[in-house]
Amino acid sequence: MDLTKLTAHELKDMLSNKEVKAEEITKAFLDRINLVDNKLGAYLYVSEEEAIKKAKEIDVKIEKNEELKALSGIPIGIKDNINVKGMQNTCASKILEGYTSPYDAHVTEKIKQEEGIILGKLNMDEFAMGSSTENSAFKLAKNPWDLERVPGGSSGGSAVAVAGSEATLSLGTDTGGSVRQPASFCGVVGLKPTYGRISRSGVVAFGSTLDQVGPMGKDVEDCALLTSVIAGLDKKDFTTVDKEVPDYKKSLTKDIKGKRIGIPKEFFGDGLDKNIRKSVEEAIKVLEANGAEVKPCSLPLMDYALSAYYIISSAEASSNLARFDGIRYGYRSKNFKDAQDIYLKSRSEGFGDEVKRRIMLGTYVLSAGYYDAYYKKALKVRKLIKDDFQRVFKDFDAIVSPTSPTTAFKVGEKKDDVMSMYLSDIYTVPISVAGVPAISLPCGMVDGLPVGLQIISDYFKEDVLFNLAYSYEQSVDFYKMRADF
């Protein structure tokens, strides 16, 4: 039996029944990483010794018949912008090359408390800016379904690790679609929770009013399991909400009778691949057959979401990334005349092109002459988009759409076409702007590549997402798909 192909809940059952040891599971994944990651590029750092040490500790507890915790013995990969004490945290950027984190992010603490085994740090677009993981300063990540194609981004490594059987679960971050789009491209399940449901403490900031940590897994049950562990109030993050986290396992039922689902016409317009449209429409029929009430709806302001997103996120990035100055830590230019020169050269040499592009855009829209015309206007548009979603959720429990207008595109195909790259997030960005939760799960294949179905719900209604996603997933076989790599 190939342990790397199993889900987290299957491995949990085997550990509980003493059919396998945690060390055996961990070594199977480490062997897999050593075998395939030179081609897949999911990991930027592997913590082999520490992972085996933790696994042995869990095996001792199992031998003593101690009760297992939620993630005991489950191998997990962490995106390289989420702090793990003693491991690198580079954000896939030259400017943080060699930086080792002195503390754990809140989500990392929660995983460690539940005895998850952290295998290492995962590849990403630099500072989470990108949709293909081609912006990593260190190496390319490849899609396990086709090595000539991208895995999506910015959490490309997180999706590749799960799809390529290099981790059972992974954590990514989602600012404008960075968990959902790679989940779609790689055929795994990925959740962007409600803004405030999961702590951002210890996560390197890109867009502070948009960033959210999101789990990825092989199926909906795995995704719900990891969400249950990391969700909840954190006093170190004032944006988290003191709201009880439901038992998401209770939502994992096929019964969705009476659930009202809206189909927004704006998500099915020009630019959507006809085969993806067909796959999503077939998925909607399955939900309807399972008892959901499906009706059309409209979100007329969605056309403005992408523009508002890039103004707001770039403005926040410009502010957040000002802290990387070549003085206290990270990359410092070797040739400089004075302090001003250190800042200029360290940042110019340390940041990649896409990061510099967004810093420049953000600085521009925050400048005195353009603040009202761009940034302030974008915030007003954001409020209207939120109102749009609230209006729809008065009549519907959820909205269904494609996750991405295309399947995974080829490496290099959009790297130099900025607008085309940005448009690959056209169905995920509105959800981020509004701050509502959404999940992506596989709903078909087009030319050998996975297609993602996006289900969106109202604030803090992740339980509704898991219910609908599980109902659909268990009615089809797409969740059993594994990349033959």
UniProtKB/Swiss-Prot annotation:
Its EC number is 6.3.5.7. InterPro entries: Amidase, Amidase_CS, Amidase_dom, AS_sf, GatA. SUPFAM superfamilies: Amidase signature (AS) enzymes (SSF75304). Keywords: ATP-binding, Ligase, Nucleotide-binding, Protein biosynthesis. It comes from the Bacteria. It catalyses: L-glutamyl-tRNA(Gln) + L-glutamine + ATP + H2O = L-glutaminyl-tRNA(Gln) + L-glutamate + ADP + phosphate + H(+). One of its GO terms (biological process) is translation. One of its GO terms (cellular component) is glutamyl-tRNA(Gln) amidotransferase complex. It is an enzyme of class 6 (ligase). It holds the Pfam family Amidase. GO terms for molecular function: ATP binding; glutaminyl-tRNA synthase (glutamine-hydrolyzing) activity. The active site is at 79 (charge relay system), 154 (charge relay system), 178 (acyl-ester intermediate). Allows the formation of correctly charged Gln-tRNA(Gln) through the transamidation of misacylated Glu-tRNA(Gln) in organisms which lack glutaminyl-tRNA synthetase. The reaction takes place in the presence of glutamine and ATP through an activated gamma-phospho-Glu-tRNA(Gln). Belongs to the amidase family. GatA subfamily. HAMAP family: GatA. Heterotrimer of A, B and C subunits. NCBIfam families: gatA. This is Glutamyl-tRNA(Gln) amidotransferase subunit A. It comes from Clostridium botulinum (strain Okra / Type B1). The gene is gatA.
